[in-house]
């Protein structure tokens, strides 16, 4: 089983690479941008892991991967990468260029990579797509996250279209909606971490390994599980 994970060198991406690499029958291909040392470490640590350079800010880099995908025979695609920062500023202070940049550096790569993988999946009449979203799209998102949540909401809706259009090809498209995780991507001050932990129902923050466990289970489920969303947020927001 060939699995492509975008953004796999750190945080949740790395946790998913390590979790899935423990299954010998899986061949993991993950993309990385700047973290070459981490990418090489993962390649050297697991015989069934392959790193591939990818920069969401570079269309040529995206196209190189897209052109390579037909030769990779991807059975499972995990869309995890996000270019940019989650936290921005209030909507009325947000420059329009922030929205267009987020679209060009996240939605366009998502579309191109997913379309390329769908081509092989349709031919073999099997495939699984897992899209990492955020629990912030449930109910009302926190202030200052308009660009990030709008981008993730776009992918969330595309996932619904994909599952509807390609279910007849035995292809599933599901979403995982994790809460905040203390990773480099979502780095905040120590006092903010303490506040979030104190306010959390379990008094502890979600860890990447916990989300990786859910993803590992999700890709084993029946093709009947299609168009489903899996919030991982200790019921802080309920769908």
Q: Where would I find each of the regions flagged by the language model?
A:
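Catalytic Tyr-X3-Lys loop
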Residues: 92-112, 126, 130, 155, ...
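Short, small/polar-rich loop/turn modules that mediate ligand/substrate recognition or access, typified
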Residues: 167, 172, 225-228
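Conserved glycine-rich Rossmann-like NAD(P)H-binding loop of the short-chain dehydrogenase/reductase
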Residues: 24-40
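C-terminal substrate-recognition "lid" of short-chain dehydrogenase/reductases
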Residues: 126, 205-232, 237-238
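Amphipathic alpha-helical dimer-interface segment in Rossmann-like NAD(P)H-dependent oxidoreductases
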Residues: 71, 105-124, 163-164, 216, ...
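Conserved mid-core segment of classical short-chain dehydrogenase/reductases
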Residues: 63, 67, 82-100, 123, ...
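Catalytic loop of short-chain dehydrogenase/reductase
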Residues: 83-84, 128-154, 159-168, 180
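Conserved glycine-rich cofactor-binding loop
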Residues: 9-10
């Amino acid at each position: 089983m060939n699995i492509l994970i975008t953004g796999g060198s750190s945080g949740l991406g790395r946790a998913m690479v390590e979790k899935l690499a423990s299954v010998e029958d899986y061949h993991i291909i993950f993309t990385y941008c700047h973290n070459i040392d981490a990418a090489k470490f993962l390649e050297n640590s697991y015989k069934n892991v392959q790193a591939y350079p990818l920069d969401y800010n570079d269309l040529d880099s995206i196209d190189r991967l897209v052109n390579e995908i037909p030769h990779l025979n991807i059975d499972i695609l995990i869309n995890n990468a996000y270019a940019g920062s989650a936290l921005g500023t209030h909507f009325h202070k947000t420059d329009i260029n922030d929205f267009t940049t987020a679209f060009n550096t996240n939605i366009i790569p998502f579309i191109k990579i997913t379309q390329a993988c769908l081509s092989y999946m349709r031919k073999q009449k099997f495939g699984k797509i897992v899209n990492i979203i955020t629990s912030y799209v449930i109910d009302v998102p926190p202030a200052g996250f308009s660009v990030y949540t709008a981008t993730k909401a776009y992918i969330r809706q595309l996932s619904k279209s994909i599952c509807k259009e390609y279910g007849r090809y035995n292809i599933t498209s599901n979403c995982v909606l994790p809460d905040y995780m203390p990773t480099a991507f979502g780095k905040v001050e120590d006092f903010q971490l303490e506040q979030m932990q104190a306010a959390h129902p379990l008094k502890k923050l979600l860890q990447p390994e916990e989300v990786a466990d859910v993803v590992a289970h999700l890709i084993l489920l029946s093709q009947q599980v299609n168009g489903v969303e899996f919030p991982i947020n200790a019921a802080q927001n309920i769908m």
